[in-house]
Curated annotation (Swiss-Prot):
It comes from Corynebacterium glutamicum (strain R). This is Ribosome maturation factor RimM. Keywords: Chaperone, Cytoplasm, Ribosome biogenesis, rRNA processing. An accessory protein needed during the final step in the assembly of 30S ribosomal subunit, possibly for assembly of the head region. Essential for efficient processing of 16S rRNA. May be needed both before and after RbfA during the maturation of 16S rRNA. It has affinity for free ribosomal 30S subunits but not for 70S ribosomes. It is found in: Cytoplasm.
Length: 171
């Protein structure tokens, strides 16, 4: 299955400890299913593909630590930095009101009828998602992805309309 049909579910941020664990930045609402012991993940990194089997996964200080069967030590874990994991959508992931990161990335950002920039990424935090936007001026800004600030996303038109509070775009 190609990554166009799959969803990114996480990304290796760095190694952790000396036993080959890695810190995974999650981009799934189902880490207990996606990162269950015995699951085989499809990883992609700089044109290389990896199939990695989960030996253990645990939360530690708000981060997911994963140990893969194929990764014996820190050196091997370090080599996985930047690896992105992809998987087919789960059957219950047809949320009418939700969006996947890949659907939001590259949307044009519209404010008061004007194209002011492009969504370049989506950050996931404890308080919710934040859109990373490159403004037409070249500046980068962050916009909370909440209905009050982003009231309309039109995937067919490729736009996200924003109504930011005063000063948000001036930062």
């Amino acid at each position: 299955m190609s990554t166009e049909q799959e969803l990114q579910i996480g990304k290796v941020v760095k190694s952790h400890g000396i036993r080959g664990e890695v810190v995974v930045e999650l981009s799934t609402d189902d880490p207990d299913i996606r990162f269950a012991i015995g699951e085989v993940l499809n990883g992609k990194q700089a044109g290389k593909e990896h199939s990695l089997t989960i030996d253990a996964a645990r939360m530690h200080q708000g981060r997911l630590l994963v140990k893969f069967a194929e990764v014996p030590d820190r050196t091997a874990a370090d080599s996985l930095r930047g690896t992105r994991f992809f998987a087919a959508p789960l059957e219950d992931e047809d949320d009418e009101d939700g969006f996947y990161d890949h659907e939001l990335e590259s949307l044009r950002v519209i404010h008061e009828g004007e194209d002011i920039g492009e969504v370049t990424g989506v950050m996931h935090g404890p308080a919710g998602e934040i859109l990373e936007v490159r403004l037409t001026s070249g500046k980068e800004t962050l916009i909370p992805f909440v209905h009050a600030i982003v009231p309309e996303v039109d995937l067919e038109e490729g736009t996200a309309t924003i109504t930011p509070p005063e000063g948000l775009l001036d930062l």
